[in-house]
From Swiss-Prot:
Keywords noted in UniProt: Coiled coil
Residues forming coiled coils: 25-67
Protein name: Uncharacterized protein 4
Length: 82
């Protein structure tokens, strides 16, 4: 069984503020760019978001899409396999 999950939340984005400025954007789709996924601060945020969701749901989640905005709002789409 596969369960699709969509989670919206808030996270502190101060440590990646310079990335938003450099890219001249207010929104980053972390899953679309391999280069972004290699940046340590983004890896940490992604892991922090994933851990928070897994702790809340009590299940492991596979991230399909993760969008983070400059204001700290994030949207995660993923799936849980059972």
């Amino acid at each position: 069984m596969r369960i699709k999950v969509e989670v919206e939340g808030k996270i502190n984005t101060n440590k990646i503020e310079d990335i938003f400025t450099a890219l001249e954007t207010n929104k980053i789709n972390v899953t679309k760019s391999q280069k972004l996924q290699q940046i340590e601060e983004i890896k940490e945020l992604k892991q922090e978001i994933k851990q928070e969701i897994e702790n809340t749901l009590g299940e492991k989640i596979h991230i399909e899409e993760l969008i983070i905005t400059r204001t700290g709002t994030y949207l995660l789409r993923g799936k849980i396999e059972k």
